[in-house]
Swiss-Prot record:
Listed name of the protein: Protein SlyX homolog
Family note: Belongs to the SlyX family.
Chain segments annotated as coiled-coil in the UniProt record: none
Organism per entry: Aliivibrio fischeri (strain ATCC 700601 / ES114)
InterPro entries: SlyX
Encoding gene (name): slyX
Length: 74
């Protein structure tokens, strides 16, 4: 009977250990997810800025294809 109680105590101890590792993993994944969300939000802001900048660019500043010199391999 003592062996059974010791086995049960060992199983409980193993489960507690597994649960602790799972909690640590969940916390680490949550931190990584939070950092990625901040990065995505920052990139979205930068993307909106760049799109706005491109929309305001004056297309008349760009040279016409006929005005540009051909590349050196021609």
């Amino acid at each position: 009977m003592t062996t059974t109680i010791e086995q049960l105590e060992q199983k409980i101890s193993d489960l507690e250990c597994q649960m602790a590792f799972q909690e640590q993993t969940i916390d680490e994944l949550n931190d990584a997810l939070s950092q990625q969300q901040l990065l995505i939000t920052n990139m979205q802001v930068q993307m909106k800025f760049m799109v706005g900048k491109m929309k305001t660019m004056d297309s008349s500043n760009m040279a016409d294809a006929s005005e540009e010199t051909p590349p050196p391999h021609y």
